[in-house]
Amino acid sequence: MQLNSTEISDLIKQRIESFNVVSEARNEGTIVSVSDGIIRIHGLADVMQGEMIELPGGRYALALNLERDSVGAVVMGPYADLKEGMKVTGTGRILEVPVGPELLGRVVNTLGEPIDGKGPIEAKLTSPVEVIAPGVIDRQSVDQPVQTGYKSVDSMIPIGRGQRELIIGDRQTGKTAMAIDAIINQKNSGIFSIYVAIGQKASTIANVVRKLEEHGALKNTIVVVASASESAALQYLAPYAGCAMGEYFRDRGEDALIVYDDLSKQAVAYRQISLLLKRPPGREAFPGDVFYLHSRLLERAARVNAEYVERFTNGEVKGKTGSLTALPIIETQAGDVSAFVPTNVISITDGQIFLQTELFNAGVRPAVDPGISVSRVGGSAQTKIIKKLSGGIRTALAAYRELAAFAQFSSDLDEATKRQLNHGQKVTELMKQKQYAPMSVFDQALTIFAAERGYLSDIELSKVLDFEAALLSYARGQYAELAAEIDKTGAYNDEIEAQLKKLTDDFKATQTW
């Protein structure tokens, strides 16, 4: 068989044309140094701030410092086996976490991976952890309540859907207990909850999850965990990951509540990362952008209007507003609310609930200090009946605190002052509440009605809580229809007032407490 030169050249051309050349361009760099969870990378030319960098073994680092000839990145996870000279790759992606209803009832880590042993999570969507907050035009004013189930909070410091209300106090003053009770109270309210645990002991978090499960609230809750044993990077990112999960509900016309427990530990984790990245320290060694750290997180909690929801869902959801309510927690040192991080978060949020060690130790639990606790926007969101009845509660407590200080130095008090002191003591006693026992709107309204209309004046101080328990039990038995109506509508009119008066008079006549 003979081949001439033309056939040979045609054959070669065919082979060349059919040859499949596959080339892959990868943005690759080399690790120059590894120390304390921070890696320096040389050669990553095209990398974004906050980009995920793929490391050997399927782990990732987060690019935070972009310098002229190197990139400073923080490793998300263990770093002991990383060595100088290893190759790393830029992914071109910002960190994303899984979001959606599939996460409800689950315990996940910062990256959205399940850690509760209940199998994988089949989430259909992911969302970037860093998202720009809704603009002014997309927002709507707060006018719907979030019932915490606490008499002292719902009457004096009401919280609305889309509000940011800070819970602040020293260690062991009941901050987490208050937030967990607020989550438990949402189990039948249609509000989804996200609990973000930052830098806490694993045993404490396990206890919280168990309590949520016991009270039937875990099925509507996502628990995001960055425990004390996790790296600083994961503790710093956990609130943003939890917020992205909450925004899924907000942007689809649902209501969600997120608890950050606590942002002091997140600020400490961020300070650690910043100092290791050699960023210049400022006040209390925090970096210059620690205010922005919290403001960009808390601004994402908002009430968005129906147009925003409709636009976001491409017209699938119409006529529904969405909200994300935030309860950030800050731990103070020896009651110092004027420290750097507490003052920052106080100025960002729409009010604060201040829990005091002295009150807690005196048995007033929840230990809410009504003097410096405020809610800047919750008043317009308060349930109508609670708003009408609770007007005098804060005044009575403030007057009582002031008079109690003078009463220590004086024995001969006039009748009016004695009456005021007596009333203040009774109201203080009445504001006490057990943990894991959130109260309905009707129960709160009836209790406050009894206090405000003078029904407690002849009750001994030690019997006030017994009187309240017996009154509520009697009301639920004899006036079930009234209770159901108030729980459903929260309305208040002359007819309801007359019924509440008759109920309390009838009960007092029984003398059974």
Swiss-Prot record:
GO terms for molecular function: ADP binding; ATP binding; proton-transporting ATP synthase activity, rotational mechanism. GO terms for cellular component: plasma membrane; proton-transporting ATP synthase complex. InterPro entries: ATP_synth_asu-like_sf (IPR023366), ATP_synth_asu_C (IPR000793), ATP_synth_asu_C_sf (IPR038376), ATP_synth_F1_a_nt-bd_dom (IPR033732), ATP_synth_F1_asu (IPR005294), ATPase_a/bsu_AS (IPR020003), ATPase_F1/V1/A1_a/bsu_N (IPR004100), ATPase_F1/V1/A1_a/bsu_N_sf (IPR036121). Its EC number is 7.1.2.2. It is found in: Cell inner membrane. It comes from the Bacteria. Keywords: ATP synthesis, ATP-binding, Cell inner membrane, Cell membrane, CF(1), Hydrogen ion transport, Ion transport, Membrane, Nucleotide-binding, Translocase, Transport. Signal peptide: none annotated. ATP binds at residues 169-176. CDD domains: ATP-synt_F1_alpha_C, ATP-synt_F1_alpha_N, F1-ATPase_alpha_CD. It catalyses: ATP + H2O + 4 H(+)(in) = ADP + phosphate + 5 H(+)(out). It is a peripheral membrane protein. Belongs to the ATPase alpha/beta chains family. Produces ATP from ADP in the presence of a proton gradient across the membrane. The alpha chain is a regulatory subunit. NCBIfam families: atpA (TIGR00962), PRK13343.1 (NF009884). PANTHER family: ATP SYNTHASE SUBUNIT ALPHA, MITOCHONDRIAL. F-type ATPases have 2 components, CF(1) - the catalytic core - and CF(0) - the membrane proton channel. CF(1) has five subunits: alpha(3), beta(3), gamma(1), delta(1), epsilon(1). CF(0) has three main subunits: a(1), b(2) and c(9-12). The alpha and beta chains form an alternating ring which encloses part of the gamma chain. CF(1) is attached to CF(0) by a central stalk formed by the gamma and epsilon chains, while a peripheral stalk is formed by the delta and b chains. This is ATP synthase subunit alpha. It comes from Vibrio vulnificus (strain CMCP6). The gene is atpA.
